[in-house]
Amino acid sequence: MSVIDHVRDMAAAGLHSNVRLLSSLLLTMSNNNPELFSPSQKYQLLVYHADSLFHDKEYRNAVSKYAMALQQKKALSKTSKVRPSTGNSASTPQSQCLPSEIEVKYKMAECYTMLKLDKDAIAVLDGIPSRQRTPKINMMLANLYKKAGQERPSVTSYKEVLRQCPLALDAILGLLSLSVKGAEVASMTMNVIQTVPNLDWLSVWIKAYAFVHTGDNSRAINTICSLEKKSLLRDNVDLLGSLADLYFRAGDSKNSVLKFEQAQMLDPYLIRGMDVYGYLLAREGRLEDVENLGCRLFNISDQHAEPWVVSGCHSFYSKRYSRALYLGAKAIQLNSNSVQALLLKGAALRNMGRVQEAIIHFREAIRLAPCRLDCYEGLIECYLASNSIREAMVMANNVYKTLGANAQTLTLLATVCLEDPVTQEKAKTLLDKALAQRPDYVKAVVKKAELLSREQKYEDGIALLRNALANQSDCVLHRILGDFLVAVNEYQEAMDQYSIALSLDPNDQKSLEGMQKMEKEESPTDATQEEDVDDMEGSGEEGDLEGSDSEAAQWADQEQWFGMQ
Protein backbone atom coordinates (compact mmCIF):
# COMPACT_ATOMS: atom_id res chain seq x y z
CA MET A 1 0.00 0.00 0.00
CA SER A 2 1.56 3.28 -1.15
CA VAL A 3 1.60 6.59 0.68
CA ILE A 4 -0.87 7.93 -1.91
CA ASP A 5 -3.26 5.13 -0.94
CA HIS A 6 -3.00 6.26 2.67
CA VAL A 7 -3.80 9.85 1.66
CA ARG A 8 -6.78 8.64 -0.37
CA ASP A 9 -8.11 6.55 2.52
CA MET A 10 -7.82 9.46 4.95
CA ALA A 11 -9.66 11.71 2.49
CA ALA A 12 -12.42 9.13 2.14
CA ALA A 13 -12.60 8.89 5.94
CA GLY A 14 -13.08 12.67 6.23
CA LEU A 15 -9.75 13.28 7.98
CA HIS A 16 -9.28 16.58 6.14
CA SER A 17 -6.83 18.22 8.54
CA ASN A 18 -4.64 15.11 8.40
CA VAL A 19 -4.80 15.03 4.61
CA ARG A 20 -3.83 18.69 4.47
CA LEU A 21 -0.71 18.23 6.60
CA LEU A 22 0.51 15.04 4.93
CA SER A 23 -0.23 16.12 1.35
CA SER A 24 1.55 19.44 1.94
CA LEU A 25 4.69 17.62 3.07
CA LEU A 26 4.52 15.13 0.19
CA LEU A 27 4.07 17.92 -2.38
CA THR A 28 7.15 19.69 -1.03
CA MET A 29 9.09 16.43 -1.32
CA SER A 30 7.88 16.08 -4.90
CA ASN A 31 8.95 19.62 -5.76
CA ASN A 32 12.42 18.97 -4.37
CA ASN A 33 12.66 15.63 -6.15
CA PRO A 34 10.42 15.47 -9.28
CA GLU A 35 11.25 11.77 -9.69
CA LEU A 36 9.78 10.87 -6.31
CA PHE A 37 6.17 10.54 -7.50
CA SER A 38 4.67 9.73 -10.86
CA PRO A 39 2.53 12.38 -12.67
CA SER A 40 -0.65 10.50 -11.71
CA GLN A 41 0.37 10.38 -8.07
CA LYS A 42 1.19 14.09 -8.01
CA TYR A 43 -2.18 14.81 -9.63
CA GLN A 44 -3.90 12.89 -6.85
CA LEU A 45 -1.90 14.69 -4.16
CA LEU A 46 -2.85 18.09 -5.60
CA VAL A 47 -6.55 17.17 -5.73
CA TYR A 48 -6.65 15.79 -2.19
CA HIS A 49 -4.73 18.81 -0.89
CA ALA A 50 -7.13 21.17 -2.68
CA ASP A 51 -10.10 19.26 -1.24
CA SER A 52 -8.75 19.75 2.28
CA LEU A 53 -8.32 23.48 1.63
CA PHE A 54 -11.89 23.62 0.32
CA HIS A 55 -13.10 21.97 3.51
CA ASP A 56 -11.25 24.66 5.52
CA LYS A 57 -12.98 27.35 3.40
CA GLU A 58 -9.68 28.59 1.95
CA TYR A 59 -11.27 28.94 -1.45
CA ARG A 60 -8.63 31.01 -3.25
CA ASN A 61 -5.89 28.63 -2.19
CA ALA A 62 -8.06 25.67 -3.18
CA VAL A 63 -8.69 27.16 -6.64
CA SER A 64 -4.96 27.55 -7.25
CA LYS A 65 -4.32 23.93 -6.25
CA TYR A 66 -7.20 22.64 -8.40
CA ALA A 67 -5.77 24.61 -11.34
CA MET A 68 -2.35 23.03 -10.74
CA ALA A 69 -4.01 19.61 -10.59
CA LEU A 70 -5.72 20.18 -13.94
CA GLN A 71 -2.39 21.24 -15.47
CA GLN A 72 -0.84 18.08 -14.08
CA LYS A 73 -3.70 16.06 -15.60
CA LYS A 74 -2.97 17.55 -19.01
CA ALA A 75 0.66 16.56 -18.68
CA LEU A 76 -0.44 13.12 -17.56
CA SER A 77 -2.63 12.62 -20.61
CA LYS A 78 0.36 13.39 -22.82
CA THR A 79 2.49 10.81 -21.06
CA SER A 80 2.02 7.45 -22.71
CA LYS A 81 3.89 5.58 -20.02
CA VAL A 82 3.78 6.20 -16.27
CA ARG A 83 7.22 6.81 -14.86
CA PRO A 84 8.28 4.45 -12.05
CA SER A 85 8.10 5.90 -8.59
CA THR A 86 11.20 5.82 -6.41
CA GLY A 87 9.20 6.63 -3.32
CA ASN A 88 6.83 3.67 -3.57
CA SER A 89 7.77 0.11 -4.29
CA ALA A 90 4.49 -0.86 -5.92
CA SER A 91 1.44 0.73 -7.41
CA THR A 92 -1.86 -0.98 -6.69
CA PRO A 93 -4.77 -0.94 -9.15
CA GLN A 94 -6.64 1.24 -6.65
CA SER A 95 -3.94 3.90 -6.91
CA GLN A 96 -4.69 4.21 -10.59
CA CYS A 97 -8.33 5.23 -9.86
CA LEU A 98 -7.66 8.91 -10.39
CA PRO A 99 -10.02 11.64 -9.16
CA SER A 100 -12.43 12.70 -11.89
CA GLU A 101 -11.33 15.74 -13.88
CA ILE A 102 -15.01 16.71 -14.18
CA GLU A 103 -15.35 16.61 -10.40
CA VAL A 104 -12.25 18.77 -10.01
CA LYS A 105 -13.75 21.39 -12.32
CA TYR A 106 -17.01 21.31 -10.38
CA LYS A 107 -15.15 21.87 -7.09
CA MET A 108 -13.24 24.69 -8.75
CA ALA A 109 -16.52 26.31 -9.81
CA GLU A 110 -17.83 25.92 -6.26
CA CYS A 111 -14.81 27.85 -5.01
CA TYR A 112 -15.49 30.65 -7.49
CA THR A 113 -19.13 30.91 -6.40
CA MET A 114 -18.06 31.14 -2.76
CA LEU A 115 -15.70 33.95 -3.79
CA LYS A 116 -18.57 35.72 -5.65
CA LEU A 117 -16.74 35.17 -8.95
CA ASP A 118 -19.72 33.84 -10.89
CA LYS A 119 -18.27 34.60 -14.33
CA ASP A 120 -15.21 32.48 -13.58
CA ALA A 121 -17.44 29.67 -12.30
CA ILE A 122 -19.49 29.76 -15.51
CA ALA A 123 -16.31 29.73 -17.60
CA VAL A 124 -15.01 26.61 -15.83
CA LEU A 125 -18.30 24.71 -16.17
CA ASP A 126 -18.81 25.84 -19.77
CA GLY A 127 -15.51 24.16 -20.55
CA ILE A 128 -17.04 20.78 -19.73
CA PRO A 129 -18.56 19.15 -22.85
CA SER A 130 -22.38 18.94 -22.65
CA ARG A 131 -22.42 15.14 -22.75
CA GLN A 132 -20.08 14.92 -19.77
CA ARG A 133 -22.08 17.28 -17.56
CA THR A 134 -23.65 15.58 -14.56
CA PRO A 135 -27.01 16.75 -13.12
CA LYS A 136 -25.30 18.75 -10.37
CA ILE A 137 -23.14 20.54 -12.94
CA ASN A 138 -26.20 21.42 -15.02
CA MET A 139 -27.99 22.58 -11.87
CA MET A 140 -25.14 24.86 -10.88
CA LEU A 141 -24.89 26.20 -14.42
CA ALA A 142 -28.64 26.85 -14.53
CA ASN A 143 -28.53 28.82 -11.28
CA LEU A 144 -25.48 30.80 -12.37
CA TYR A 145 -27.01 31.62 -15.76
CA LYS A 146 -30.23 32.70 -14.06
CA LYS A 147 -28.36 34.94 -11.65
CA ALA A 148 -26.48 36.49 -14.57
CA GLY A 149 -29.75 37.17 -16.41
CA GLN A 150 -29.02 34.63 -19.17
CA GLU A 151 -32.46 33.07 -19.30
CA ARG A 152 -32.19 30.88 -22.40
CA PRO A 153 -29.12 28.84 -21.34
CA SER A 154 -30.54 28.70 -17.83
CA VAL A 155 -33.77 27.12 -19.11
CA THR A 156 -31.76 24.66 -21.21
CA SER A 157 -29.68 23.60 -18.20
CA TYR A 158 -32.71 23.20 -15.93
CA LYS A 159 -34.41 21.06 -18.58
CA GLU A 160 -31.31 18.89 -18.82
CA VAL A 161 -31.44 18.35 -15.05
CA LEU A 162 -35.08 17.26 -15.34
CA ARG A 163 -34.28 14.98 -18.25
CA GLN A 164 -31.85 13.08 -16.05
CA CYS A 165 -33.70 13.55 -12.73
CA PRO A 166 -37.43 14.16 -13.36
CA LEU A 167 -38.14 14.64 -9.63
CA ALA A 168 -35.67 17.52 -9.22
CA LEU A 169 -38.24 19.90 -7.71
CA ASP A 170 -35.88 22.86 -7.35
CA ALA A 171 -35.14 22.64 -11.07
CA ILE A 172 -38.91 22.70 -11.66
CA LEU A 173 -39.16 25.87 -9.57
CA GLY A 174 -36.28 27.33 -11.56
CA LEU A 175 -38.11 26.75 -14.84
CA LEU A 176 -41.35 28.21 -13.50
CA SER A 177 -39.49 31.29 -12.26
CA LEU A 178 -38.20 31.79 -15.82
CA SER A 179 -41.77 31.90 -17.19
CA VAL A 180 -41.80 28.38 -18.61
CA LYS A 181 -45.43 27.25 -18.75
CA GLY A 182 -46.60 24.93 -16.01
CA ALA A 183 -48.06 22.51 -18.56
CA GLU A 184 -44.70 22.20 -20.32
CA VAL A 185 -42.91 21.55 -17.05
CA ALA A 186 -45.53 19.00 -15.98
CA SER A 187 -45.10 17.12 -19.26
CA MET A 188 -41.44 16.55 -18.39
CA THR A 189 -42.47 14.68 -15.23
CA MET A 190 -45.46 12.79 -16.63
CA ASN A 191 -43.68 9.47 -17.08
CA VAL A 192 -42.44 9.31 -13.51
CA ILE A 193 -45.86 10.34 -12.15
CA GLN A 194 -47.50 7.49 -14.04
CA THR A 195 -44.95 4.85 -13.10
CA VAL A 196 -44.11 5.69 -9.47
CA PRO A 197 -46.86 5.20 -6.86
CA ASN A 198 -48.08 7.99 -4.54
CA LEU A 199 -46.92 10.83 -6.82
CA ASP A 200 -50.37 11.95 -7.97
CA TRP A 201 -49.87 15.19 -5.98
CA LEU A 202 -46.93 16.33 -8.11
CA SER A 203 -48.97 17.73 -11.00
CA VAL A 204 -51.02 19.79 -8.52
CA TRP A 205 -47.80 20.94 -6.84
CA ILE A 206 -46.43 22.15 -10.19
CA LYS A 207 -49.72 23.92 -10.91
CA ALA A 208 -49.60 25.67 -7.53
CA TYR A 209 -46.10 27.03 -8.02
CA ALA A 210 -46.90 28.04 -11.58
CA PHE A 211 -49.53 30.34 -10.03
CA VAL A 212 -46.94 31.56 -7.51
CA HIS A 213 -44.52 32.62 -10.23
CA THR A 214 -47.19 34.36 -12.30
CA GLY A 215 -48.25 36.43 -9.28
CA ASP A 216 -51.70 34.83 -9.01
CA ASN A 217 -51.62 34.67 -5.22
CA SER A 218 -55.25 33.75 -4.59
CA ARG A 219 -55.21 30.72 -6.93
CA ALA A 220 -51.81 29.68 -5.60
CA ILE A 221 -53.16 29.80 -2.04
CA ASN A 222 -56.23 27.75 -2.95
CA THR A 223 -54.16 25.15 -4.80
CA ILE A 224 -51.58 24.74 -2.02
CA CYS A 225 -54.37 24.56 0.56
CA SER A 226 -55.90 21.69 -1.41
CA LEU A 227 -52.52 19.94 -1.31
CA GLU A 228 -51.96 20.65 2.37
CA LYS A 229 -55.34 19.20 3.28
CA LYS A 230 -54.44 15.85 1.75
CA SER A 231 -53.63 13.42 4.55
CA LEU A 232 -50.22 12.42 3.14
CA LEU A 233 -49.02 16.03 2.82
CA ARG A 234 -50.64 17.49 5.93
CA ASP A 235 -48.29 19.50 8.16
CA ASN A 236 -45.54 19.72 5.55
CA VAL A 237 -43.24 22.56 6.63
CA ASP A 238 -42.34 23.63 3.08
CA LEU A 239 -45.99 23.89 2.04
CA LEU A 240 -46.84 25.84 5.20
CA GLY A 241 -43.91 28.18 4.54
CA SER A 242 -45.11 28.74 0.99
CA LEU A 243 -48.64 29.45 2.24
CA ALA A 244 -47.30 31.93 4.79
CA ASP A 245 -45.31 33.72 2.10
CA LEU A 246 -48.32 33.82 -0.24
CA TYR A 247 -50.59 35.26 2.45
CA PHE A 248 -47.87 37.85 3.07
CA ARG A 249 -47.77 38.79 -0.61
CA ALA A 250 -51.56 38.96 -0.71
CA GLY A 251 -51.59 41.39 2.22
CA ASP A 252 -53.15 38.95 4.68
CA SER A 253 -50.71 39.44 7.55
CA LYS A 254 -52.88 37.63 10.09
CA ASN A 255 -52.96 34.32 8.20
CA SER A 256 -49.33 34.73 7.20
CA VAL A 257 -48.23 34.95 10.84
CA LEU A 258 -50.43 31.98 11.75
CA LYS A 259 -48.88 29.78 9.05
CA PHE A 260 -45.34 30.84 9.99
CA GLU A 261 -46.07 29.98 13.62
CA GLN A 262 -47.51 26.62 12.61
CA ALA A 263 -44.43 25.81 10.51
CA GLN A 264 -42.14 26.94 13.33
CA MET A 265 -43.89 24.65 15.81
CA LEU A 266 -43.42 21.68 13.48
CA ASP A 267 -39.74 22.51 12.87
CA PRO A 268 -38.08 24.54 15.67
CA TYR A 269 -34.91 24.79 13.56
CA LEU A 270 -36.67 26.34 10.56
CA ILE A 271 -34.77 29.28 9.03
CA ARG A 272 -36.28 29.78 5.58
CA GLY A 273 -38.98 32.45 5.59
CA MET A 274 -38.23 33.57 9.14
CA ASP A 275 -37.00 36.94 7.81
CA VAL A 276 -40.50 37.70 6.53
CA TYR A 277 -42.02 36.40 9.77
CA GLY A 278 -39.72 38.65 11.80
CA TYR A 279 -40.65 41.63 9.65
CA LEU A 280 -44.36 41.01 10.19
CA LEU A 281 -43.87 40.80 13.95
CA ALA A 282 -41.83 44.01 13.93
CA ARG A 283 -44.47 45.81 11.90
CA GLU A 284 -47.07 44.80 14.47
CA GLY A 285 -44.91 46.29 17.22
CA ARG A 286 -44.04 42.92 18.78
CA LEU A 287 -40.40 43.89 19.20
CA GLU A 288 -39.77 41.59 22.15
CA ASP A 289 -40.93 38.63 20.05
CA VAL A 290 -38.69 39.82 17.21
CA GLU A 291 -35.70 39.98 19.54
CA ASN A 292 -36.37 36.46 20.82
CA LEU A 293 -36.77 35.16 17.28
CA GLY A 294 -33.48 36.74 16.24
CA CYS A 295 -31.63 35.17 19.18
CA ARG A 296 -33.11 31.76 18.39
CA LEU A 297 -32.12 31.99 14.72
CA PHE A 298 -28.57 33.07 15.55
CA ASN A 299 -28.28 30.01 17.78
CA ILE A 300 -29.30 27.86 14.82
CA SER A 301 -26.97 29.48 12.27
CA ASP A 302 -25.34 32.86 11.77
CA GLN A 303 -24.30 31.91 8.23
CA HIS A 304 -27.77 32.57 6.81
CA ALA A 305 -29.24 35.96 5.96
CA GLU A 306 -32.45 35.44 7.95
CA PRO A 307 -31.12 36.03 11.51
CA TRP A 308 -29.43 39.25 10.41
CA VAL A 309 -32.60 40.48 8.69
CA VAL A 310 -34.73 39.73 11.75
CA SER A 311 -32.29 41.60 13.98
CA GLY A 312 -32.30 44.41 11.41
CA CYS A 313 -36.10 44.60 11.56
CA HIS A 314 -35.88 45.04 15.32
CA SER A 315 -33.41 47.91 14.86
CA PHE A 316 -35.44 49.50 12.05
CA TYR A 317 -38.66 49.62 14.05
CA SER A 318 -36.69 50.85 17.06
CA LYS A 319 -35.63 53.75 14.78
CA ARG A 320 -31.98 52.71 14.89
CA TYR A 321 -31.53 53.05 11.15
CA SER A 322 -27.71 52.97 11.08
CA ARG A 323 -27.70 49.61 12.82
CA ALA A 324 -30.48 48.33 10.55
CA LEU A 325 -28.36 49.39 7.58
CA TYR A 326 -25.35 47.45 8.87
CA LEU A 327 -27.40 44.33 9.58
CA GLY A 328 -29.05 44.49 6.16
CA ALA A 329 -25.64 44.79 4.50
CA LYS A 330 -24.37 41.79 6.47
CA ALA A 331 -27.38 39.75 5.34
CA ILE A 332 -26.75 40.67 1.70
CA GLN A 333 -23.12 39.67 2.10
CA LEU A 334 -24.26 36.21 3.18
CA ASN A 335 -26.96 35.93 0.51
CA SER A 336 -27.02 38.44 -2.33
CA ASN A 337 -30.39 37.03 -3.42
CA SER A 338 -32.14 37.83 -0.13
CA VAL A 339 -35.03 40.06 -1.15
CA GLN A 340 -35.94 40.89 2.43
CA ALA A 341 -32.36 41.97 3.16
CA LEU A 342 -32.41 44.29 0.15
CA LEU A 343 -35.72 45.78 1.28
CA LEU A 344 -34.40 46.27 4.82
CA LYS A 345 -31.26 48.01 3.64
CA GLY A 346 -33.20 50.09 1.12
CA ALA A 347 -35.68 51.23 3.78
CA ALA A 348 -32.88 52.13 6.19
CA LEU A 349 -31.09 54.14 3.50
CA ARG A 350 -34.34 55.92 2.61
CA ASN A 351 -35.03 56.87 6.22
CA MET A 352 -31.46 58.15 6.54
CA GLY A 353 -32.03 60.44 3.56
CA ARG A 354 -29.83 58.46 1.17
CA VAL A 355 -32.64 58.04 -1.35
CA GLN A 356 -30.58 57.37 -4.48
CA GLU A 357 -28.73 54.51 -2.79
CA ALA A 358 -32.05 53.15 -1.56
CA ILE A 359 -33.43 53.19 -5.11
CA ILE A 360 -30.60 50.89 -6.27
CA HIS A 361 -31.52 48.31 -3.62
CA PHE A 362 -35.24 48.39 -4.37
CA ARG A 363 -34.56 47.95 -8.08
CA GLU A 364 -32.42 44.90 -7.36
CA ALA A 365 -35.22 43.51 -5.18
CA ILE A 366 -37.65 43.99 -8.07
CA ARG A 367 -35.28 42.13 -10.41
CA LEU A 368 -35.13 39.19 -8.02
CA ALA A 369 -38.84 39.17 -7.13
CA PRO A 370 -40.87 40.79 -9.92
CA CYS A 371 -44.17 39.54 -8.45
CA ARG A 372 -43.67 41.02 -4.97
CA LEU A 373 -45.57 44.27 -4.56
CA ASP A 374 -43.56 45.42 -1.54
CA CYS A 375 -40.47 45.76 -3.74
CA TYR A 376 -42.28 48.23 -6.00
CA GLU A 377 -43.70 50.04 -3.00
CA GLY A 378 -40.25 50.69 -1.60
CA LEU A 379 -39.13 52.16 -4.91
CA ILE A 380 -42.25 54.31 -5.24
CA GLU A 381 -41.79 55.63 -1.71
CA CYS A 382 -38.27 56.70 -2.69
CA TYR A 383 -39.63 58.53 -5.72
CA LEU A 384 -42.21 60.30 -3.58
CA ALA A 385 -39.59 61.17 -0.96
CA SER A 386 -37.54 62.87 -3.67
CA ASN A 387 -40.65 64.59 -5.17
CA SER A 388 -40.34 62.52 -8.35
CA ILE A 389 -44.10 62.14 -8.67
CA ARG A 390 -43.98 61.49 -12.40
CA GLU A 391 -41.61 58.52 -11.99
CA ALA A 392 -43.75 57.23 -9.13
CA MET A 393 -46.88 57.47 -11.28
CA VAL A 394 -45.24 55.63 -14.19
CA MET A 395 -44.07 52.84 -11.88
CA ALA A 396 -47.45 52.53 -10.13
CA ASN A 397 -49.26 52.31 -13.47
CA ASN A 398 -46.82 49.63 -14.67
CA VAL A 399 -47.40 47.59 -11.51
CA TYR A 400 -51.16 48.00 -11.92
CA LYS A 401 -50.98 46.69 -15.49
CA THR A 402 -48.48 43.92 -14.75
CA LEU A 403 -49.90 42.46 -11.53
CA GLY A 404 -53.55 43.19 -12.27
CA ALA A 405 -56.27 45.25 -10.62
CA ASN A 406 -56.37 43.93 -7.07
CA ALA A 407 -56.80 45.76 -3.78
CA GLN A 408 -53.05 46.15 -3.33
CA THR A 409 -52.22 47.55 -6.77
CA LEU A 410 -55.27 49.83 -6.68
CA THR A 411 -54.17 51.20 -3.31
CA LEU A 412 -50.60 51.68 -4.49
CA LEU A 413 -51.76 53.67 -7.51
CA ALA A 414 -54.13 55.68 -5.31
CA THR A 415 -51.25 56.46 -2.93
CA VAL A 416 -49.37 58.16 -5.76
CA CYS A 417 -52.51 59.94 -7.00
CA LEU A 418 -53.01 61.44 -3.54
CA GLU A 419 -49.70 63.28 -3.93
CA ASP A 420 -51.05 65.35 -6.83
CA PRO A 421 -54.03 67.69 -6.27
CA VAL A 422 -55.12 67.11 -9.87
CA THR A 423 -55.63 63.36 -9.34
CA GLN A 424 -57.50 63.43 -6.01
CA GLU A 425 -60.76 62.23 -7.56
CA LYS A 426 -58.97 59.40 -9.32
CA ALA A 427 -57.44 58.39 -5.98
CA LYS A 428 -60.91 58.31 -4.42
CA THR A 429 -62.25 56.08 -7.21
CA LEU A 430 -59.29 53.70 -6.94
CA LEU A 431 -59.64 53.42 -3.17
CA ASP A 432 -63.36 52.73 -3.44
CA LYS A 433 -62.60 49.91 -5.88
CA ALA A 434 -59.93 48.51 -3.57
CA LEU A 435 -62.26 48.58 -0.56
CA ALA A 436 -65.05 47.01 -2.60
CA GLN A 437 -62.72 44.04 -3.18
CA ARG A 438 -61.32 43.93 0.36
CA PRO A 439 -63.15 46.12 2.92
CA ASP A 440 -60.64 45.20 5.64
CA TYR A 441 -57.45 45.92 3.66
CA VAL A 442 -55.56 48.14 6.10
CA LYS A 443 -53.52 50.16 3.61
CA ALA A 444 -56.61 51.05 1.59
CA VAL A 445 -58.50 52.03 4.74
CA VAL A 446 -55.61 54.23 5.88
CA LYS A 447 -55.41 56.05 2.55
CA LYS A 448 -59.18 56.49 2.33
CA ALA A 449 -59.14 57.91 5.86
CA GLU A 450 -56.38 60.30 4.81
CA LEU A 451 -58.54 61.51 1.95
CA LEU A 452 -61.59 61.95 4.20
CA SER A 453 -59.45 63.85 6.70
CA ARG A 454 -58.41 66.30 4.01
CA GLU A 455 -62.07 66.83 3.16
CA GLN A 456 -62.90 67.09 6.90
CA LYS A 457 -65.49 64.32 6.54
CA TYR A 458 -64.79 62.96 9.98
CA GLU A 459 -68.10 61.14 10.47
CA ASP A 460 -67.56 59.23 7.22
CA GLY A 461 -64.04 58.42 8.34
CA ILE A 462 -65.25 57.13 11.71
CA ALA A 463 -67.78 54.86 9.99
CA LEU A 464 -65.08 53.58 7.62
CA LEU A 465 -62.68 52.83 10.46
CA ARG A 466 -65.29 51.17 12.68
CA ASN A 467 -66.26 48.92 9.80
CA ALA A 468 -62.61 47.99 9.14
CA LEU A 469 -62.03 47.25 12.84
CA ALA A 470 -65.11 45.05 13.15
CA ASN A 471 -63.17 41.88 12.30
CA GLN A 472 -59.59 42.86 13.07
CA SER A 473 -57.50 44.89 15.48
CA ASP A 474 -54.77 47.09 14.04
CA CYS A 475 -52.67 49.71 15.83
CA VAL A 476 -52.72 52.24 12.97
CA LEU A 477 -56.48 51.99 12.47
CA HIS A 478 -57.19 52.44 16.19
CA ARG A 479 -54.88 55.45 16.29
CA ILE A 480 -56.49 57.11 13.26
CA LEU A 481 -59.95 56.44 14.70
CA GLY A 482 -58.76 58.20 17.85
CA ASP A 483 -57.67 61.20 15.76
CA PHE A 484 -61.06 61.37 14.04
CA LEU A 485 -62.92 61.09 17.36
CA VAL A 486 -60.93 64.02 18.73
CA ALA A 487 -62.02 66.03 15.69
CA VAL A 488 -65.69 65.47 16.60
CA ASN A 489 -65.09 66.08 20.33
CA GLU A 490 -65.53 62.44 21.38
CA TYR A 491 -62.64 62.70 23.80
CA GLN A 492 -63.27 59.72 26.05
CA GLU A 493 -63.63 57.24 23.20
CA ALA A 494 -60.63 58.81 21.48
CA MET A 495 -58.60 58.13 24.61
CA ASP A 496 -59.83 54.53 24.56
CA GLN A 497 -58.71 54.12 20.94
CA TYR A 498 -55.25 55.51 21.68
CA SER A 499 -55.00 53.10 24.62
CA ILE A 500 -55.91 50.14 22.41
CA ALA A 501 -53.36 51.27 19.80
CA LEU A 502 -50.63 51.46 22.44
CA SER A 503 -51.57 48.06 23.83
CA LEU A 504 -51.02 46.64 20.34
CA ASP A 505 -47.80 48.58 19.77
CA PRO A 506 -46.29 50.22 22.86
CA ASN A 507 -43.74 51.94 20.62
CA ASP A 508 -46.32 53.76 18.46
CA GLN A 509 -45.18 57.34 18.97
CA LYS A 510 -48.14 58.96 17.25
CA SER A 511 -50.67 57.26 19.54
CA LEU A 512 -48.61 58.33 22.54
CA GLU A 513 -48.49 61.91 21.28
CA GLY A 514 -52.26 61.93 20.72
CA MET A 515 -52.89 60.67 24.22
CA GLN A 516 -50.48 63.15 25.80
CA LYS A 517 -52.07 66.02 23.91
CA MET A 518 -55.50 65.04 25.19
CA GLU A 519 -54.25 64.78 28.76
CA LYS A 520 -53.04 68.37 28.57
CA GLU A 521 -56.40 69.57 27.35
CA GLU A 522 -59.79 69.43 28.98
CA SER A 523 -63.18 68.90 27.43
CA PRO A 524 -65.74 71.79 27.66
CA THR A 525 -67.98 69.67 29.93
CA ASP A 526 -65.23 69.18 32.49
CA ALA A 527 -64.37 72.87 32.37
CA THR A 528 -68.01 73.85 33.05
CA GLN A 529 -68.26 71.42 35.95
CA GLU A 530 -65.11 72.87 37.48
CA GLU A 531 -66.52 76.41 37.22
CA ASP A 532 -69.77 75.29 38.92
CA VAL A 533 -67.81 73.81 41.79
CA ASP A 534 -65.80 77.01 42.13
CA ASP A 535 -69.02 79.10 42.24
CA MET A 536 -70.55 76.86 44.92
CA GLU A 537 -67.42 77.16 47.03
CA GLY A 538 -67.50 80.93 46.56
CA SER A 539 -63.84 81.02 45.86
CA GLY A 540 -64.23 83.73 43.26
CA GLU A 541 -61.38 82.20 41.30
CA GLU A 542 -61.83 81.34 37.68
CA GLY A 543 -60.42 78.22 36.18
CA ASP A 544 -57.11 78.83 34.48
CA LEU A 545 -57.82 76.28 31.79
CA GLU A 546 -59.67 77.62 28.82
CA GLY A 547 -61.83 75.35 26.71
CA SER A 548 -60.52 75.13 23.21
CA ASP A 549 -61.68 73.49 20.04
CA SER A 550 -59.39 70.53 19.47
CA GLU A 551 -58.45 69.98 15.88
CA ALA A 552 -57.86 66.51 14.49
CA ALA A 553 -54.49 65.18 15.55
CA GLN A 554 -52.19 65.21 12.58
CA TRP A 555 -51.54 61.55 11.91
CA ALA A 556 -49.82 62.59 8.72
CA ASP A 557 -47.90 60.00 6.80
CA GLN A 558 -48.56 56.38 7.49
CA GLU A 559 -45.80 54.42 9.18
CA GLN A 560 -42.70 53.51 7.24
CA TRP A 561 -42.48 49.99 5.96
CA PHE A 562 -40.15 48.07 3.66
CA GLY A 563 -42.72 45.55 2.56
CA MET A 564 -46.28 46.80 2.11
CA GLN A 565 -48.95 44.23 2.54
UniProtKB/Swiss-Prot annotation:
Belongs to the APC7 family. InterPro entries: TPR-like_helical_dom_sf, TPR_rpt. GO terms for cellular component: anaphase-promoting complex; cytoplasm; heterochromatin; intercellular bridge; microtubule cytoskeleton; mitotic spindle; nucleoplasm; nucleus. SUPFAM superfamilies: TPR-like. The gene is Anapc7. V-shaped homodimer. The mammalian APC/C is composed at least of 14 distinct subunits ANAPC1, ANAPC2, CDC27/APC3, ANAPC4, ANAPC5, CDC16/APC6, ANAPC7, CDC23/APC8, ANAPC10, ANAPC11, CDC26/APC12, ANAPC13, ANAPC15 and ANAPC16 that assemble into a complex of at least 19 chains with a combined molecular mass of around 1.2 MDa; APC/C interacts with FZR1 and FBXO5. Pathway: Protein modification; protein ubiquitination. GO terms for biological process: anaphase-promoting complex-dependent catabolic process; brain development; cell division; protein branched polyubiquitination; protein K11-linked ubiquitination; protein K48-linked ubiquitination; protein ubiquitination. Residues 513-565 are annotated as: Disordered. It is found in: Cytoplasm, Cytoskeleton; Nucleus; Cytoplasm, Cytoskeleton, Spindle. Disruption phenotype: Mice lacking Anapc7 show growth delay around weaning, although birth weight and adult size are normal. They show sensorimotor dysfunction in locomotive assays, as well as defects in the regulation of short- and long-term memory retrieval of the contextual fear response. Loss of the protein does not alter the anatomy of brain regions. TPR repeats lie at residues 101-134, 169-202, 203-236, 237-270, 339-372, 373-406, 407-439, 442-474, 475-508, 509-531. This is Anaphase-promoting complex subunit 7. Residues 528-549 have a biased composition (Acidic residues). It comes from Mus musculus.
